[in-house]
Amino acid sequence: MPAYRSRTSTHGRNMSGARGLWRATGMTDADFGKPIIAIANSFTQFVPGHVHLKDLGQMVAREIEKAGGVAKEFDTIAIDDGIAMGHAGMLYSLPSRELIADSVEYMVNAHCADAMVCISNCDKITPGMLMASLRLNIPTIFISGGPMEAGKVTYQGETHAVDLIDAMIKGADQNVSDEEALAFEKESCPTCGSCSGMFTANSMNCLIEALGLGLPGNGTVVATHADRKELFLEAGRRIVDLARRAYEGDDASVLPRSIATFQAFENAMTLDIAMGGSTNTVLHLLAAAQEAGVAFGMSDIDRLSRRVPCLCKVAPNVPDVHIEDVHRAGGIMGILGQLDRGGLINRECGTIHARTLAEGLDRWDISRSNDPKVVEFYKAAPGGVRTTEAFSQSKRWAEVDKDRTAGVIRSVDNAFSKDGGLAVLFGNLALDGCIVKTAGVDDKNLTFSGPAVICESQDEAVAKILGGQVKSGDVVIVRYEGPRGGPGMQEMLYPTSYLKSMGLGKECALITDGRFSGGTSGLSIGHVSPEAAEGGAIGLIQAGDIIDIHIPNRSIAIRVSDAELEKRRQAMQALGPKAWKPVDRDRQVSAALRAYAAMTTSAARGAVRDVSQLER
């Protein structure tokens, strides 16, 4: 039987000083020997997805203590990508993922915690904590703060469910009055929680369910609903059981690396493709796989994207459908259930709530479960009241959405499209691949060719789009915004939103070595690898070059010869210190960001640290 890690600091006369300090935190003799459970919270008043988390860590702590454990809470940082968007703040978003992973590792290892509950929610916090949990490989349960309710706006005589992206598009549309734009702004984010569409935060919280590290409903019960409280309480009870199984029962099956196997990563990516999740999830799954020691890469994503259909479309891919509607249709277990029927997932993977995913689906998939409590659970509805309080309402739908023919979640036979919601493209423009969210691409744009409009930064792209320098049929190239070139791999939500507001959302393509918000839709191709700053061909494109995009064939190319590209490469190399750097870009980059850039890898590797640099 492996000893509890915490005994390193709680047992033996030589640890009397440490025990003295533990006693000062409230521990007693009776606590020395119990499992110490770290609660990694992420409360902050900066972020609506985290503003309601302040007291929830202590609520979980009390449940841990009732179950026989000792709970110790700490907080991580949390950046709001929406507030950081469109200015230099976005440079810090992706790098914060590594800081979060490191800080969780530091706290847990420094204090010898035995197990962990991760209370996360928004874009980089869930991935950062996921990376840490796989590094540490101690029993871990994830519980998210939950999605925001969608807003409601009456516009041009019709009432619509709206979200942050609608407000951004209307705010930039000169045909929308100030009063109308303000109405969208005020109603787009009506409650606490992560933004209400299938954006990055909600995508990641849904994928946690597929990986097996979260409870059913983790990704879909709205933050305001009383049912989410039970998820938090159950996480507190269950983590003590997992800790005892791991240490007292020598059961390694409950450890994160035993659960998040190659097959589990396949399940998570399969879900992502089926629900048209954010392209950022690709970065985060690749990064998490590396922490788990799992050889899951772009070729695997490409393979899965060719066989998994699109079973669920949610904003921003379609209007008026949000995460609250996915929950009513059976949530993530409902989507996984349909994928299981199609033979598209690995049903023998373990989870923290059931021995296998198959057993979990038998209980939680509303298409096969006879448990009235499960059906009642998926009736949890938005309350429709502006609030920043968690668990503040208990409204329920009259019935769940079991329609698998034309409902929010479809069967494989009635899929929205045979091809899934994400695709990996390769070609001379992206030798190591790039990502497009096909669920958000209009059918007419699945093949697209047009002349390149070169932008050496996101700011230049915004200026050219709003300044009328981008025309129908153009391909906007935004480069030197990758992990190293940005640095920080900014999201391009403003350029894509402004294309929509200018009436060009379905008339242009945008290609970048940066990334996109989960709120992006349209022909938006990101994560181009290698990036320009690493010598990628995106840095060799010239204004007017024809770019050919063929999503069905998974190809993307600059329409110039190999000889011409080599000629341009040699000319670039001849620039010496100025080679592979943006032209005339005025950007202040802090020492912290320069340190990130010096260590990061390409998007094709998840933009994780190049640890080989540490082996010198």
UniProtKB/Swiss-Prot annotation:
Enzyme class: lyase
EC number: 4.2.1.9
Cofactor note: Binds 1 [2Fe-2S] cluster per subunit. This cluster acts as a Lewis acid cofactor.
One CC-aspect GO term: cytosol
InterPro entries given in the database record: Dihydro-acid_dehy_C, DihydroxyA_deHydtase, DiOHA_6PGluconate_deHydtase_CS, ILV_EDD_C, ILV_EDD_N, IlvD/EDD_N
Span of the signal peptide: none
Gene Ontology MF terms: 2 iron, 2 sulfur cluster binding; dihydroxy-acid dehydratase activity; magnesium ion binding
Pfam families: ILV_EDD_C (PF24877), ILVD_EDD_N (PF00920)
Positions of [2Fe-2S] cluster binding: C122, C195
Cystine residue pairs: none
GO biological process, one term: L-valine biosynthetic process
Annotated catalytic residues: S517 (proton acceptor)
Catalytic activity reported: (2R)-2,3-dihydroxy-3-methylbutanoate = 3-methyl-2-oxobutanoate + H2O; (2R,3R)-2,3-dihydroxy-3-methylpentanoate = (S)-3-methyl-2-oxopentanoate + H2O
Top-level taxon in the UniProt lineage: Bacteria
Chain sites annotated for binding Mg(2+): D81, D123, K124, E491
Pathway(s) this gene product operates in, as recorded in its UniProt entry: Amino-acid biosynthesis; L-isoleucine biosynthesis; L-isoleucine from 2-oxobutanoate: step 3/4; Amino-acid biosynthesis; L-valine biosynthesis; L-valine from pyruvate: step 3/4
Keywords from the named record: 2Fe-2S, Amino-acid biosynthesis, Branched-chain amino acid biosynthesis, Iron, Iron-sulfur, Lyase, Magnesium, Metal-binding
Function as written in the Swiss-Prot or TrEMBL entry: Functions in the biosynthesis of branched-chain amino acids. Catalyzes the dehydration of (2R,3R)-2,3-dihydroxy-3-methylpentanoate (2,3-dihydroxy-3-methylvalerate) into 2-oxo-3-methylpentanoate (2-oxo-3-methylvalerate) and of (2R)-2,3-dihydroxy-3-methylbutanoate (2,3-dihydroxyisovalerate) into 2-oxo-3-methylbutanoate (2-oxoisovalerate), the penultimate precursor to L-isoleucine and L-valine, respectively.
NCBIfam families: ilvD, PRK12448.1
HAMAP family: IlvD
Subunit: Homodimer.
Protein family according to the UniProt entry: Belongs to the IlvD/Edd family.
Protein name: Dihydroxy-acid dehydratase
Lineage: Bacteria, Pseudomonadati, Pseudomonadota, Alphaproteobacteria, Rhodospirillales
This protein's encoding gene: ilvD
